[in-house]
Amino acid sequence: MKRKLYAGINILGLTVAIVSFLAIALYVHHEATYDKIYSDSDRVVRFAQKFVRSGEEQVVAMTPSALVPALMEEIEEVEVATLIFDYSIFSSVLIDAGEGNREETKFAFVDENFFEIFDLELLAGAEGKLLAAPNQIVLTFSAAQRYFQKPLLAVGNTIKVDSKDYQVTGIVSDFPSNSHIDFDFLASFISTRHGKEPQWSPANYYSYAKLIPNSDREAFTSKLDQLVEKYLGEQLRSYGFEVSILYQPLTSIYLGDSQLKEMKPVSDIKNLYIFGSVAFLLIIIGIINYVNLATAESTERNKEVGLRKVLGADRPQLFGQFISESMILSLSGVIFSLLILYLLKGVFEEFSGVSMNLELLLSPLGILLVLSLMLSIGLFSGFYPALILSGMEPLRALGKKITGFASGAWLRRSLVVFQFFVSISLLLSTFIVKKQLDFMQTINLGYEREEVVALNFHYNMGEKYSALKSELERTAAVQSTSLTNSLPIFIQAGYSISPGGDNDKDLMLTGFAVDHEIVKTLNLHLLAGVEFSDQDINQTAAYEENAEMNIILNQAAIRELGWTVEESVGRKVNFNGLISNVKGVVQDFYFNSLHNQVGPLVIFIQPSEANWILAKLPKGNPKENLSKMEDVWKGVYPERPFAFRFLDEEYAQMYQREQNVSRIFQLFSGIAIFIASMGLFGLVSYVAMRRTREISIRKVLGAKATDVLKILSSDFFLLLGLSAMFSIGFGLWFSQEWLSGFAYKTDISPWIYVLAIAFVGLIALLTIGYRTTKVFLQNPAKTLKDE
């Protein structure tokens, strides 16, 4: 019965460890192979613009539309180039395939060379240039399924995009989940104004090139610099800018340095190193768990070893037998792991936020990984117990005089220390990541994000906005509304101002285009001056006449300009080519990720640049207010569906990557503690069995269960204390590494360390207490008789 129990615990421990290892391996593979799914991905680069002004620099992932044709015509190292105009940045689109409008967000314009670089599988359509003519569109298979009963027969059909007809020329496979590009609809770029007439301004396009094989990168860089100088250098220097075009390998975008206006949030390669380490640590503590349980079980197998040696078995035969047993357990663990991995695929995908491709485990490399894992676990876990058991002397084994174990006490204690260390360290990591996440979710951003609704604002809706605004406010469903070019959680548009006078320092800063009620809608804290008024709206029409306009600056901008808050109001600056008056100063608010410092910001009136309507709802009854808003919306914009986002939910979504990391840490720290507890159970079992006679005598002499618990647990808690010291060192290092990626970070209290150590200690105490109680309840008379 005991053999079955130990075998069950061994298989369970190894299975959990192997499942964890394989799940993490698939996650790491998914992240590490971002954008490597495309042919010749090692030859593909993406371009970015680097602006330098007054010693300040910005790197923006977007470039002008004229860059791609210039690359194709003037740089021989370029085999083919393409560009993407991500329309979802500015607005959603309405798609109608004959059964009514549906709003879609994953829409982009691309040129005819797109599929020569991003070679998705063509499921339907003619090979060649799919998007060479105006008003052509390619759908992914998922998008085609939404609009056509027979998606592969959609080619040749016409669909309406914002009431304009587009002909479907192809159906392609969906973009892989590990691609930084992800659209459902790809329309021909030549359908747009800049597609017909490429321009060197504005820079609203993502540009890529496939270089010729074995291209000279130094020569390519030199020619790129010459091209930039030819078309942009003189013009931008006249504005005080130095500009250069950088290029970045396609395969390093996701795990590389983040740039402004990234198409998709990037990740951090440090996370992959961390999770890879966690995977190996879980396997190691799974092996330790097996060793400890095998050691405990060996006290039950000494007679078997002695008898077999008396009957002629030699040490190699016994060694082979015990290794074979560990290999069988390892094989069982792998088989159960693959089954569990298949069954829990969806759970892990929800935890990690990535899709798991189990087919990778059936590839030659995947099969090699699984076999190597099985053999490694079998050999490493079985070697030490096999060495000890096969080395027993027959007479001492039969007489229960086990001499080999005492000499290995240091190893077993070291293994326990390591298990405690891993468990506490993972728990500490979980607490640290979670505390930073909580800090980010509860920090005062400097503006209202609760009860603020964002509505996507389409470019052709402007003429009806006044009607929408007045109707909404008449219903009391909203307190105020404001048009903006960005959500306040993520503002990226770049501008510059020149203060003039004695201060000749030009300042690069971020621009927030709004209407006059932005301060009221977001409840911004005005430190000096006054907020915008409806009279400021009239300035928009006068911009071309170089009329004076009003702007509001934040504290960071004021500091950079060397002004005080009070003296800033009324100052004149040159902003965007216009003489502008500083009308007010607002307290700094977080308009970007907390990974970055709050930078200089200018707020200015320009509703024509708006992409969003922000609506501040009254407190309480959000469903009722949204219902009223929808009724008003349908009355003003019946052709567009009512779609809304809560600002606080969008803010939380910004940190989805960190939330995924936190959930993964929670999951695997729990698994580590579970496996370590089973290993501890095995070692306590071993100690309790060795001291059964002593415990029985103490019980006869009147000892209580708590007395026995103190005796058996004292050594383990000394080991826990030693582990805690190592874990504290790890925790200090991890907190510094993890938090270094945030400009604004939480304070890590010493109580976090105490809590992690105490939690693991409690689990250990419960494990030891359970086993001790079981031994204590045995009949001492029977135990002493057996002895």
Task: Describe each region flagged by the PLM.
Residues 24-91, 101, 202-209, 221-223, ...:
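Membrane-proximal extracellular/periplasmic loop immediately following the first transmembrane helix
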Residues 111-124, 137-267, 467-657:
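Mid-to-C-terminal secondary-structure elements
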Residues 1-5, 38, 228-279, 299-300, ...:
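Membrane-helix entry/capping segments
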Residues 2-29, 267-303, 330-331, 411-436, ...:
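Hydrophobic alpha-helical transmembrane segments of multi-pass inner-membrane transport and secretion
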Residues 1-9, 13, 286-329, 391-402, ...:
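Intracellular coupling helices
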Residues 23, 327-394, 435, 714-776:
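Small-residue-rich transmembrane alpha-helices
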